[in-house]
Amino acid sequence: MRVYDAVTRIGGIKDFEFKDIISCERPDRYRNKAQFPIGRAKDGSAVFGFYSFHTHRIIPCDDCLLQPEAFNSVIEITKRFIDKTNADIYDETTGKGRLRHLYMRLGEITDELMVCYVVNGNGLKQEDELVRMLKDGLPNLKSVIINSNREKTNVV
């Protein structure tokens, strides 16, 4: 009824056929792309999530129900890599640090996984170790990309 009301009242359309709404077959885990800024929590641990409105503060997201579960595995492996290598994480306020964003795609039909890291500079220290960890933990991994963004912005 809300849709009908919006179309007639807001849209000004009076004469149309209104059919029943068909619900989504898969209300969760239907997205095939995700991107997360990477930062540090107050305790120093790596945090992946979303920016709080109009801030550089990252709200942690351990499991977004819109995204494939495989993305959680990528995040966990990346956290282990950061802990193991003490990887330098980018700080939005100072513009210093290396590892900025994690971007992922999953092929719905092929189940192939693409992982992209956005870094401040050229490459990533010990990136061979990161690739090894990803390959060991993700049998459907198809590609790993290191993308350089040196601009002082949180735009990927």
PLM features: residue spans?
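Accessory RNA-recognition modules of RNA-modification enzymes
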Residues: 1-156
